[in-house]
């Protein structure tokens, strides 16, 4: 655990506005490989969440509203963390998540953990990425600052 948190602290310096978003490949709910760079040309929100996270679940209706409003220019990628595959898939189905959903396995080494690479230290964490693949902003928690920034960015 200590090594994981040290890596998160090191990653924080790289996950800032204007920096390239680290590329990754993870499995989708239908067991296909998804690579972040495949969405170049669109705005992207990485939503780091888990089925166990109350605030993550409470934020789903608002995320759906923004997704419906901006889906012609925006893709959301739900990155499930610290879950079992079964709980993740059940949550995707139960909450009818309409966007891309990928699973970040909890048993991978910290150096291969996407949540570590994106310096996620709490949930939910949302990262807005521009069509050029550069990070626009990172937002921890479920609050209006993320939605205001997203609206201002995409409008």
Model-found features: residue ranges?
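Structural microenvironment flanking redox-active thiols in thiol-disulfide oxidoreductases
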Residues: 58-96, 107-116
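N-proximal helix/coil linker or "cap" segments that precede and/or mark the start of modular domains
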Residues: 1-27, 32, 37, 42, ...
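Active-site acidic short loop of glycosyltransferases
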Residues: 40-42, 72, 97, 120
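Alpha/beta-hydrolase fold active-site loops
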Residues: 43-44, 124
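Thiol/disulfide oxidoreductase modules built on the thioredoxin-like
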Residues: 97, 106-154
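Structural recognition of the beta-strand scaffold that forms the well-ordered cores
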Residues: 44-47, 75-78, 100-103
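Conserved redox-active cysteine motifs that mediate thiol-disulfide chemistry
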Residues: 40-41, 47-65
